[in-house]
Every structure is written in structure tokens, then in C-alpha cells.
């Protein structure tokens, strides 16, 4: 198990867990690992960007210093979305990219996320190689001087290139649909108006005035309450909410109901399939997707492949088997015909495109999708990793699954950050689902509860 890297890079409380010293080490060691195979005489090129957090520049300057110290040329993009950076790495032929962001997390947190030359997140093996250098007793990496040092070049024009790329994926103006857009006071805030205006959208924005401290503050993809109210108040047909780095999109229908990533993928996937454009008639999701998603797809003659939690694993599955649509319930949606990572603004525009092409409201497009009631209990345990070694727990899960008779599912998994075992079930009614969860929780508490 990795020490510093989680499912989405290195994260922590800025200036405490994630310090400038750590950012320098990540720049130096990460930069070396990502560019060490360059031929002699070729200077490596790395793009660096950030979201709108007050700690972003502090960490950015430290990280860039680390990159420069191993002779890397840095293109400083400024504030841009994470998918924007991913696109620019590929478009500019860079060796790597680094985004400084903690996505949907609160302002006190920040993170450092690396991308390879393909614009994709790093493999576990590469992250492990970086961690070994961070923890090494000495520093034996190159220390060039004079002309061997790296330089920094301003590349703020990258934003315009990225917006043009997204606009080019939309074949016609998206007029006729009134939309309210929540920018989470994050990285998309300065981009939304430029992009959606160029796509002919009738829109208003909320939470697009970042001040360094208000990112994700009761707004964005994880707090849609105010967007839901605003959609109804304005009589809009749609609401779109992005998170701090805009790799997620959560929607709101014309009635003010939240529409998560499962529902967005169902709408886009069904439309693509109807037009023969959904590869292998399959959508890739994680184990967290609601059983109702799979059932709705089955009615359409479509399939659902599931991976472990994390959009990187969805992306890996899509590339390995040639699928072109996947994502997470949380709003990461990957449309690989256009982009190789989740992109909130791209997703929102393509959801609008389906609405315009079909002439249907979002609630109409979702009328055949019925979520299964879900029950979830977090059980404090002594050793979360050992739960599969307890036969009584495995037995009760098997018994519950047998009783469900294909009309429900169980998911038991350890928390990634706390000493908890998450026990989740879905079933035909809330009462039955809660009873299933309770049966399993009682055995877990008896076997390994604190």
C-alpha cells in the first residue's frame, strides 16, 4: 500500500500535512521519475497548474523549484481545470503535467496530482517509485548548474486552447435550453462564461467568484442545494454543478431534483447506443453505482462492467477493453471519444446536446431509471484489512445475497482513510434493505468491532 499517494494524488492539509517542503520533494523526485528516460541533450517539459485555493501558489512555487532543480522546463498554466491540464499535456507534447488541487475537498486541503505524457494519472508502480525517492536517506538525483537548470515559461494561453477543444466536440449551438451553472468558486469559474457563450447556451452562473477561501463552500458538485433552488426559481430546464477542479459534473433536472453520475451516464449512454456509437453496448462504472443503473441498462439491452472505486480504474478498464463511456456515481464521466479523463464542462455540454437532439426534458429521459433504496452503515473495527479472514462475516453476506435472489446487492469494503468497515446493501424497499444491512453489521461488530 502506498504511503503518500491516494486514489487521486497526494493530499493533505496545506502547510501542515502537505507542506512546501513536501511539494519541493514531489517536484524534484516526481519530475525525475517522469522524465529520466529523455535522451541526452533533450530538455524535459512539464506543465504545472492549480485551482483557486489560497494555498495553491505556495505549493506551486515550491513544486516548480523542485522541477527546475532537476533541469526540467516548466510551462506555468495558471488556474485551469484538471481535465484542462490533462488535455494540454497531450496537445503540447509535454512529458508530464502536475495539477495542484484537492478537487471537491474543503479549502484547507490541497493536493498534488501527476499526469504522464498521455494525460493519464500515474500507475501504482510509478507512484511507488516516486515514494521510494521521497523516503530515501540521501538525495542522489542530478544537480545541474548554469545552463543545465530548468526555466519557467508563462503558458496562460493554454486555457483558450482547451476551451476551443471542448467547443469543437459540440456540432451545433445549444440554444433553447435555459441552464443555471454552479462553478464551485473553483477552477472553472473564469472559463464557464467563455465556453458556454461560444456554444450558444442561454445560461446564468452562481458561485463563480473565487477569493481563495470560498472554493466548494456550500456549493459545487457536493452541495447542490442552492443550485436546485435556483433552477426552480429561474424556471430553467437544467442545472449543472462542477467541483473545485471541474472533473465532476452533477446535474439538476427542471423540477429541482439532483441527477448524479449514474443518471448522466445512462442518458448519454442510451443516446449513443441508439445511434450505434456506444462501443460494445457497455458502460463502465465502479462498484458504488446503484443497482438501478444496471437494471435500467439491461432494459435497453446494454451492459455494465464494474471496477473498484476510483475513476483511474474506470479509465484503465475502458482502455483495456475498448469501451468509450464510463465514470462514477460522484460525477466523473469519461467520454473517451473526446477526452481520456472525466471532464465536468464537457459532460455538461454533451448532456445538453442529448436534451436538444431528443427534444426531451431531463426528467423524461430518466423516466425508466429507478434507483434501488440503499442502506449504509460504517462500522468501527480493529483491523479493517482482515475482514475477509472472518468466516462468519463471509457466511452472513452469502446468506443475505441468497435471500435477495438477484433483486439486490451487498457491498462490504474498508474505508480508505479511517478504521471503518463500510457495509452497504441495495434492495427493492428501504425496509428490506435496512434489515439486510443490520444482519451483516451485527456479525461484523461481534467479530471485529472496537
Swiss-Prot record:
- Active site, renumbered: 103 (phosphoserine intermediate)
Reactions accelerated catalytically: alpha-D-glucosamine 1-phosphate = D-glucosamine 6-phosphate
Q: Phosphoserine is carried by which residues?
A: 103
Binding of Mg(2+), residues: 103, 243, 245, 247
Its PTM note reads: Activated by phosphorylation.
GO BP terms: carbohydrate metabolic process; peptidoglycan biosynthetic process; UDP-N-acetylglucosamine biosynthetic process
* Entry keywords, A to Z: Isomerase, Magnesium, Metal-binding, Phosphoprotein
Which InterPro entries does the protein's record reference?
A-D-PHexomutase_a/b/a-I, A-D-PHexomutase_a/b/a-I/II/III, A-D-PHexomutase_a/b/a-II, A-D-PHexomutase_a/b/a-III, A-D-PHexomutase_C, A-D-PHexomutase_C_sf, A-D-PHexomutase_CS, Alpha-D-phosphohexomutase_SF
MF terms (GO), sorted A to Z = magnesium ion binding; phosphoglucosamine mutase activity; phosphomannomutase activity
Q: Where are the transmembrane segments?
A: none
The record's free-text note on cofactor binding: Binds 1 Mg(2+) ion per subunit.
Q: What is one cellular component GO term in this UniProt entry?
A: cytosol
Any idea what job this protein has?
Catalyzes the conversion of glucosamine-6-phosphate to glucosamine-1-phosphate.
- What's the protein name? Phosphoglucosamine mutase
The primary gene name is glmM
